[in-house]
Each structure stands twice: as C-alpha cells, then as structure tokens.
C-alpha cells in the first residue's frame, strides 16, 4: 500500500507537545564516553545526558582568551560517533568522540568546543610509517552497503580515519557551468579509501563495516605528535544544518512502554542525524495498525527540539514523499535536507519582472551602452543549456593583435537592489543542478529568456574587452556595459569539431543557425583564434604555478518518457571546454583587480586557502613509500609532479586518476570573502590558480555572488553610486553564498549518486576495470575507471579459500586464494597491492539505492567493451 500523496496536517514547527521528561532508548553506536553517561541509574530524578550550553557571554570571553575554539562540525558518515572541527593551527583536526561530546550539534553547524585534558586526547600510533591516508570524503549520505557477508566474529581494535574533509575545491569556470547537469560533479559518491591498516587484526577476522569498538588508550608518555587533540561541544554558534531529514517511520520496540502509546520513531537515512521521536497524532492515520504498509515510504521530518535528558530528538513530520528508491521522492528529500528552496516564485517576486512581453530594450538604455550588435559574437555551451551566461568574440586587428571580448549577461539590470526579487535571489544564492533538472536562482523568464544570451536577439551585457598579442599578453583592457546580438549558439561539440578540423569547411547542416550578417567561416575562424590564444594562456598559467586536479565525472543519458537513466559515460573535458574556461578565468581575474583597486574595503573576492598541511604531509610520506616522490612545496610543484610522473599508457593514466583523487582530499574549499575583513593580503590568494586576486563575474544567472560583483563593477565604472554597505554585512552575504554553494555541491553529488544507483539496479550488473587505491588487511578500495566511482571490496564477500595480509617493505599487500571452479584444479592466487589493475562487477543489492562492488575471479573472460549506455 503506497501513500505518495499523503499530506500531514501539522501544527507549526517549534511547538513541542510537552515531552520535557522523555528519555528514549539508548542511542545506537555510541562511543564508550556516551555509554558512561547512559549507564547512570535512571531511578529517581532523571539525569542529563548532555551538558547545558555555556552562556553567550562566557563563550565570547572564552573565544577571545583562546580557551575555546570555534569551527564547522564534520561528522564521519560511516562512523557517526566520530566528529571533527579544523584545528586553528592547520595541524591535525580536533577530534570529538561520541554523540554526548557532540552535544546535540549536527553536521555543518558552527560550534564552539573546549579541549579535553591531554590524558583524554586520541592516541595516534606513532610507529605507523605506512600512513593511513585521511581519506573519508564528507559524503552526505552513509556509505552504501558493500555486499560483504558478516561472520560471527567482531571487529577488533580498528581505529578509523582521523579526518573528514570538505569536498574538493574546483574553481575553474567550467565547473558545473550552464546547466550541464550530467557530468559536472566530481565522482558519484565520496567513499572511503585507505592505505595500510594500522590495526593488528587477525587476517581471518572479517571487516564489519559499521562496527567500531575503541579500546581504552593510555596516552601517558606519548609525544604531542602522537596525540590528536580531543574536545567537546559547549555551544552552537549557528545551526547551519537544516534540521530536516528524510527517512522511514517505525514503531517503538517496547510495546509496553508509555512512549509506545505517544510516539513513533523516525529513522533518518543519514545516520549522522539522530533518531527522532514523532508524536503518533502526526503520523498517518493507520500507521499504528498497519505499520508495514509504510515500511518503504519516505517521510521528511524536522527536528524541533532536543533536550538535555533525551538521547533522541523530538520532531515533526513535514511530508510523505513516496516510495524509497524512486527518483522523484528521493530527489525531493535531498533538496529538503539541504535547505534548497525549490518552491515556485511568489507573485510578489514575479511582479518585479517586466510585465509587457515580448520585452524590448528601452531606447534610453541603448544610448547608455556600447553597441556591439554588429560584431561576430557567439555562445559556446552544453547542447542542453538554456541559461546562457556568457558569449565570446575575437577579431584579428591590422597590427596582428586580437580584440577579444567576454560578454556576460547583465542580470543586475533586471534585479533591482532591495527588491523582492533581489532578496529571494540572495537567499537562494545559487542555482542547483540536478541530473534531471535545475532549481533556478532566478525565475525562468530571466534565466532562459530576458537574461540568457540567446542567438539573434538583442541582449544587455557587461563586457570585458582586451587587446591581446597572439601569445595572450594583455596590451589594453576595457570594462563596460554593452548590447550584443549573438549570431549563433554553438555547443561544445560544434566548437570542438571546428578546432579539430581547422582547414575544412564544416557543412551548414551540421551547425546551428547562424545570423545572415555573419558566415560559418567567420565564426570558425574566431573559434580557431580563441583556441590558439587560450592554449597560450593555459600554458602560461601552468608555467606560473597553477594546479588542476581533474577527477572523473559522470554524465547520464535519460529516457525522455520515464526519466530513468538509460546509460552513463565519463564526461570528457576537451579543448572547447578549455577555450571557454581560459577566457572566463581571465575575465574574473581582471574584474577582481578592478573592484579591489576601486573598493579595497568592499570588494567581494574569492580566495582559496592552501591545503591542510597534516593530510598533505601524510600523503607525501605515503607516496614516498610507494616509490613516487612528490614535490608539494607549491601548487605548481604539485602540478608538475602529477604531470611528469605519468605516461600515456592505460596503467599510467589510471594511476594518475588515483593520485589526483588522493591529492584532491587535503585541498580546502575556495571561499567568497569581503576584502575589508582580512588585513593580510596574502590570505586573499587563490592557491590552485596561484594568483593574488580572483572573483566570480561570469555566471550571474546562476550565482548571486556574481550579481554582487556586477554591482561593484558598475559602481567602479561610475554607472551607479558607490556601495553603501559595511564590510561585515558583505561578509555575511559572502558566508551565505559559501554555505549555499557547498549545499548545492552536496545535492549535485547525491543526485548523481542516486541516478547511478538506479542505473546499476535497472541495467546492471555493470563490469569495469578498476585500480586499487588502498589496501587494508581484510578489504581494499578501488576506483572504478569506467564510471569514476569508488568502492570498498571486502574479502569475505568473495569466493575465497583464504586471504592474508602482509607488508612487503612498507607496501601493504593482500594475497587472495580463490576456490577453484573444478575440484581437480589448483586454487588461483591473486595479489592485491596499491595501483593493481583489477576487474570488478557492480551489482544492485536488495536495499533501495545500494550496490556492491565484487572482484571478478582472475582468468574469467573480461568485460565486453560494449557500452550498456547510449
């Protein structure tokens, strides 16, 4: 019995129904520290499980004196009792052990912590020269089931990764550009990879994925480098987590308890969110009598309270979504969890748009702008793009130089500052790109019509125009408001064809319509000139010390009728993509310098901090052990190490993908900031681009930060008054843009993970070559090269006679002995080391959206090269 349309009639959030005395069952998976709290006698007066938060005044004083530390909380998605905040000294992250120490804070919250006494710090084994790379991504869903078959033995003494880090930085302007929703998110799912295990487990003991039994640690006599600072949360500065979760409803286990008569238990899909008591009166009417009818129904629940004396939070059902594992219910759940506003724009917002359509540019506005409508200007975008932010132009001058223009949609013209439209765009802060659709920052009339630089239509733009040498050296630079009329809408495929066939005339029927004022040859030559200059710009950027870490990205083909994935492929980043990227980067850097020179205290810029030093040094040590010396003294040095180490053969390219993935992990996120809030200009720098100043100017249709930058540039050029905004106010908007951008990236990752899981179910099993990324003593991690996903393979999931783990020098090695197919045959032996190439099979599990990676037996026929996709 399905209930996809069941709506819940609820009171408004924030009105709990008198449950201050409720103490629920013990939380699952608690740390030893948690258990001490819960094992206290509950007879008589109830004792608090969580500490009372400190007062604002005491917190403020403690932060000033340095006795307290603030940071963003990150919870390990696979071991939810482990949490971390960054250490202010850039060293190993500060460890927060257990739900009790976390004190009701949720993932992403800005928290204040107090360090525990040193004898309570986490011991990190000093003899472990074979560094376990801190490699668990900040995935926003629990690890998928990995298909292992648990035996009756328990896991012993295994200590998990010390650090969970944020997703990889990516500041190229090709990043999720223009609604290219299929293939612009790194990886399908961020899973754990590890190198040699630190534990001393018996190799016959299976790895139990969700268990962790820490052993008491005597930290006396250990050096400071052997200890990881540990802390407890004493205050939540900002509840950045939405307090919403998707999951399923269950009856409480104890039918005789008073709680059973009042509450159901909401079990979130994300194990980092606590279980939640939901009043039965908020549940579907027949839930108590027929709970199994709802066993596979997804609900959204919002936490409204979490008291000091209760293991579980109190919540309120918000909506019934539909069946778990189906794309639309799961998508709505993802959007809700991450606070994405996907509601229709209000009538008040829509009234801010031009009401008389078709809209034309007012004559007085034409007179205020440089008229470029006769120039050969065109867009290059994914074929499916509708929100065309940018256009390009290039013409050779008589002296052999080039005039190159980057023309960006003038969104700020249509979004008056302080209007209802401005406020909702500022709140949304970014468009969110899912595999199957876009949740726009602005109403579609703006995104797809008025602002979008559609061909053969007059459009308002903000332009940067340079006079460049053939080598890309800037001789002159001009900024200003313009009017353009794009002559054609090229796709990346069209531009790539022009680049690959420089002397051939491309038939008109293979190209989109071109305005009669311009010819195919004119557009073709402009693309070739842009490509030639872009190659020089790119070469010089890397000579000057830039770094690029491209990870495998997955793109999908969808069935037009059902919306289900028909196939997928690795997104190919080609010369046409690089062409656009180089000129977007050039424009962003130029605008950054212009607005900072004019408004040194009020410029909205984008900085990229250097990588986390502890993780990076551990990774370098690991590479040394593997015979791969790496220079990480600068971004450019790292880029050279990655590029010079590898050849063009299949094995070398796969190894480069693995190392690129590993070196992405210590990288921090790039951040928007207000220039007036940082005194040291060295902190303005962008590590990966290796430039002193950078901003975002080129995508105002989908990023609100770009709208702010457009307004600053307009003021810098005298088009409008100087900005009347305090630096701290601008910083708050920058922080909000950072938060929403991070949430958007998470949603993109989860959307891709959702579609890939559905594809495995519908089209699987899927076979691929994979490269081993990490070896533990009973499992190993692989990068599945055909699909760009990372999976852990457990030895006890395989048809093995035995397996053993050893170190050869410092390198970890698993020896697998396969059961023979024929009793008369000898067992097959297979050695697994880091960078081994293996064949794997991805197959769906019974649980919705879960799939396993299974190692193929050596000697079996390899997977066909025939694609199951497209």
Swiss-Prot record:
GO terms for molecular function: 3'-5'-RNA exonuclease activity; magnesium ion binding; poly(U) RNA binding; RNA nuclease activity. Residues 12-32 have a biased composition (Low complexity). This is DIS3-like exonuclease 2. InterPro entries: Dis3_CSD2, DIS3L2, Dis3l2-like_C, NA-bd_OB-fold, RNase_II/R, RNase_II/R_CS, RNR_Ribonuclease, Rrp44_CSD1. SUPFAM superfamilies: Nucleic acid-binding proteins. It is an enzyme of class 3 (hydrolase). GO terms for cellular component: cytoplasm; cytosol; P-body. Interacts with XRN1. It comes from Mus musculus (Mouse).
